[in-house]
Amino acid sequence: MDRKGIVLGSKLAVFSMILLWHRHGVDQPRNPWSDGPEFITQCPIRPCGNFTYQVILFEEEGTLWWHAHSDFDRATVHGAIVIHPKHGTTFPFNKPDKEIPIILSEWWNDDVENVLDEAKRTGGDQGNTYLLRVINTGLTNDMFFAVAGHCLTVVSIDARYTKPLTVDYIMIAPGQTMDVLLEANRTLGSNSRYYMAARAFITLPVDTIPFNNSTATAIVEYTDSPTARPPGPPEFPLLLPAIKDEDAAMAFVDERMLIDIDVNFLPCDTTNATNKLCKGPQGNQFAASLNNVSFESPAIDVLDAYYYGSGRGVYEEDFPNKPVNAFVNPTGDNGGRPLLTKRGTKVKVVEYGTVVEVVFQDLSSENHPMHLHGFAFYVVGRGSGTFDERRDPATYNLVDPPFQNTVSVPKSSWAAIRFRADNPGVWFMHCHFDRHVVWGMDTVFIVKDGKTPQAQMLPRPPNMPEC
């Protein structure tokens, strides 16, 4: 187990910016104090203040990432974390000749003044194998990614090794990381330049929200090509899915939860003409929910309230194991599902060591990348339509399921995960589309202390930011 102390300071006083720092996919054993989400495990770092994060690495190995965790700050405040094998060990596959981090993100027109039209290249030699560490840091979209003329072999997801899978393209959700091997196996004398391309995947009608569906590209160029032959135009990935290609997107348990994921509305005070939030249908406010509960951030962080035993009035320990208003048989339009929701700061409390199964049921018209802090989980099942608790568990993969910290749940579909609650503390679970986090598509798991000192949460650091 490695422990690192890293000081984060907010010196942007002129912009009155507040900062929070989350290491996405780092489990932080017994140490929720340094996890980072705003008003869940700490209060914000105010301008000109600082806070020392204690980063604890345990079993993670591979590619993770870090980002701000307050509103939309992570649109630009993010970066890669690469955790190499321990000394004396190596990858569970042939060592690549080179490693290349690739960060996929979104371009926000409101934040930039000039756009430079330039292509950035990376050179490679024929016969070499390259490990591409792909990270989707975007706020709103799953991304397709491919390299023309080459296959990709997925060897790790969210810093956990997986059974190698060779594909023409990958689909990566916001918040996810994937390590993929690229073999530079084109024949000598063929084209020496190939496009590396990324394209967003959306399920909403394109005319619903103005959207630039352009494809981001970079150029992979072989450096050992005969100099006598001038380089031709790069080849484009022919198998990169279209922007709305939905087909391409597509034990023992102590605690079972069925969680409906939905985008809905909150009643709004339409008599207040200055209320800018009342922009939804019939003057309602846009919201999002888990099990018909739209999470409301408290005035003080949940972790402090739990630690001091003062949770009363801050949160309620009655997050439902099943939807409050169940909706059966979701279809493409999901007509008839409950559209109004209610606010609440409801959390789920579990005993240390509990094996938890969560089935996410997507009722909305878009995908949702669901992320759990403090844990990695097994993705044991997926399916389209309504989850059938009698039939569908028989289809679970309990032999070699992927081990991840973010799972993408397609629209009108379900995904089942399992994890052991062996990390005491307060842990945020949320959709990684930031607008949905702000709207309330989140909740909190509180894992109680175990009986031994090694199974108990670490003491509160003395320099935690004040609310």
Swiss-Prot record:
Function: Lignin degradation and detoxification of lignin-derived products.
GO molecular function, one term: copper ion binding
Top-level EC class as recorded in UniProt: oxidoreductase
Entry's EC annotation: 1.10.3.2
Protein known as: Putative laccase-16
Location of the Plastocyanin-like domain: 7-88, 98-225, 318-451
UniProt entry tagged with the keyword Secreted: yes
Residues holding Cu cation 1: 22, 371
Binding-site list for Cu cation 4: 368, 431, 436, 441
Pfam families membership: Cu-oxidase (PF00394), Cu-oxidase_2 (PF07731), Cu-oxidase_3 (PF07732)
Entry-linked CDD domains: CuRO_2_LCC_plant (cd13875), CuRO_3_LCC_plant (cd13897)
Organism listed in the record: Oryza sativa subsp. japonica (Rice)
Cell compartment(s), UniProt: Secreted, Extracellular space, Apoplast
